[in-house]
Amino acid sequence: MAKMTTLKMKERLEKELKAPNRQFAYNRDNDTLSITQDGKKVTLTIPQIIANYENDGDEAIEKIIYYVEEGFQAASGKVELRNNQSNIYPVVRATSFPVETKTGERLLADEHTAETKIFYAFDLGKSYRFIEESMLEKENITREQIREFAFQNLAKLDIPLKKDSVNGNDFYFVRTNDGYDASRLLNVNFLRDMREKLTGEMVLAVPHQDVLIIGDIQDNTGYDVLAHMTMDFFADGLVPITSLPFVYNNGKLEPIFIMAKNRLKE
């Protein structure tokens, strides 16, 4: 495979994503490519895309194309909250995630942990649109009702687990690619049930939106493996959330920092 440069990747993305009413802006300092359509903007980090391309080839670019196209489609999608309560879900994002749209509309959001925030989304099938506070006023629906619908729908989602083990430490993965894998972190009944099944310390990670990792950690090797795993997923994710795992104790999630071969204090 020929070496992919920043310029080559920029040109390929522009070619693949070219469409009417769509503009491109390249930031040389940050190596980012911004795509704007009808007032909506998506920004891509080219070095990250190149790294994924070197691992996965054209599949990495296809994922980016899909992500951008679905994002613009979601932004233009019509949302009717009151008659479609079953389409409302909570989604987890980093605390640094913007709380306003580019047009100044404030997104409906709740605090969660020091590393994560809860937003609310309207499912559009292959993508979703974040719910804006102004939508609630237009449809005469409250924040409490949105929360109730969202968490009721979350509780109905299947949670298939794939297990892997390293030196007596078990790791469970949720990767359905339905857009709500990280959201399963908010399912309190699921977390409680998992805590009862595990014998070691329960540590969870949501490095990006399409994966939830649960570790049954028995020793320092387990923490080390989880730390490396979380960083790898965080670097590869289209929508990164946090590289810090969480310890689950007494129904609460506390972020921790793990160094190789050692577990640091919370």
UniProtKB/Swiss-Prot annotation:
It comes from the Bacteria. InterPro entries: DUF1444 (IPR010838). It holds the Pfam family DUF1444. Coiled coil: none annotated. Belongs to the UPF0354 family. This is UPF0354 protein lwe1624.
